[in-house]
């Protein structure tokens, strides 16, 4: 029996996104090693074939912002049809009681749904770390590896709870030192670099209003030190804009820049309520947007 991964011809697709691959592609160990033109056969010795005549051949889709754990509560009736802040306060107490087995189930369900829709790469933003979810990212790494998903797992965080005037219960809030220490541990343990990396880590304070300014600044510094990316929610609702102006005396993007986040290392979730000047600034900085209204 051969010890190397099999060479597979994905043969004669119904349609292909690349005309040079109208006859399919030859793959081995997760890589395309040959594109086959229409009416041709592979030059490479093939060990198995997959009949793609009823399939469309295209690159895997990429989901740039997800919350795997929320898969379990997407039909939770008390939270339906609510604006962001009331929706969050309704669900935080539910999420605070999730455990690692439930997170593993939610992550598997979310990733299988993505794979079935043609999505092979996903960025997940997990920021709920109760006592039962201390190793949430470790659980997600294991699940992603088992399913063969390329995962950019962002280590989220919340350091401002209800006792400090925030939205989440104290049971899911962590202190800044714990957040930074755990972020460092996860990067050192799991972050892969270079072509073909299947698991990468990013730092992802939940939002400007759920963490301290200190954590925003220190996360940016740690990301630069470790050469990883930054992710957070920004400009998702008008309520957020008003909250930032009241709390910080500036708009969300100005606060982002003041904390060292406005760079090409950063991509933001939502990004709905930017004015024209802010859109131009984002473009000049090379900051990405996962635009999901």
Where do the model's predicted regions map?
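Histidine-centered catalytic micro-motifs
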Residues: 59-71, 229-238
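Alpha-helical scaffold segments that flank or form the walls of functional sites
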Residues: 74-125, 130-150, 181-195
């Amino acid at each position: 029996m051969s010890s190397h991964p099999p060479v597979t011809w994905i043969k004669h697709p119904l349609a292909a996104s690349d005309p040079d691959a109208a006859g399919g592609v030859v793959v081995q160990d997760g890589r395309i090693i040959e594109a086959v033109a229409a009416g041709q056969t592979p030059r490479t010795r093939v060990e198995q074939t997959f009949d793609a005549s009823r399939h469309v051949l295209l690159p895997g889709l990429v989901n740039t912002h997800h919350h795997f754990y929320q898969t379990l509560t997407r039909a939770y009736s008390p939270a339906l049809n609510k604006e962001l802040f009331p929706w969050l306060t309704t669900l935080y107490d539910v999420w605070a009681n999730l455990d690692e087995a439930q997170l593993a189930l939610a992550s598997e369900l979310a990733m299988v749904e993505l794979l079935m829709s043609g999505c092979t790469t996903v960025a997940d933003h997990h920021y709920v770390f109760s006592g039962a979810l201390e190793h949430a990212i470790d659980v997600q790494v294991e699940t992603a590896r088992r399913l063969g998903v390329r995962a950019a797992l962002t280590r989220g965080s919340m350091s401002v709870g209800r006792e400090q005037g925030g939205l989440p219960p104290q049971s899911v809030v962590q202190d800044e030192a714990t957040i930074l220490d755990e972020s460092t541990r996860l990067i050192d343990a799991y972050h892969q670099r270079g072509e073909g990396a299947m698991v990468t880590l990013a730092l992802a304070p939940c939002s400007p209003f759920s963490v301290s300014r200190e954590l925003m600044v220190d996360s940016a510094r740690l990301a630069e030190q470790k050469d990883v990316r930054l992710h957070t929610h920004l400009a998702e609702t008008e309520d957020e804009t008003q909250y930032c102006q009241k709390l910080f005396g500036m708009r969300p993007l100005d606060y982002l820049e003041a904390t060292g986040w406005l760079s090409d290392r950063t991509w933001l979730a939502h990004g709905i309520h930017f004015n024209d000047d802010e859109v131009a600034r984002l473009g000049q900085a090379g900051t990405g947007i996962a635009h999901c209204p």
